[in-house]
Amino acid sequence: MKVTWEQGFKRIYKKKIKNNQELKKRFWDVMELFSKNPFSPRLRTHKLTGRLEGLWAFSITYDCRVIFKFLDDDRVLLIDVGGHEEVY
């Protein structure tokens, strides 16, 4: 699975994850798993509804989610990352 980042995602990553070493390590561990199997039960990947219809989400931690979009069978675009209340 090829993973690309939306420009806005890069800014959010730098702001919320980059300087938190524990969350940063967890993020990259989860991203490795996601790139191998985006529907691993550990990720709790799910389709979104309502105003976010067409997008998907998976969990980094209990409260931290990544919002993404499937571009095709082999590519995804990361859109947002943050707490449940921030991204939904």
For each feature predicted by the language model, list its residue ranges.
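Nucleotide phosphate-binding site architecture
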Residues: 10, 49, 88
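Residue-level signal for alpha-helical context at structural boundaries
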Residues: 27-31, 45-49, 66, 70
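A short, surface-exposed loop/turn module that caps and links secondary-structure elements
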Residues: 33-58
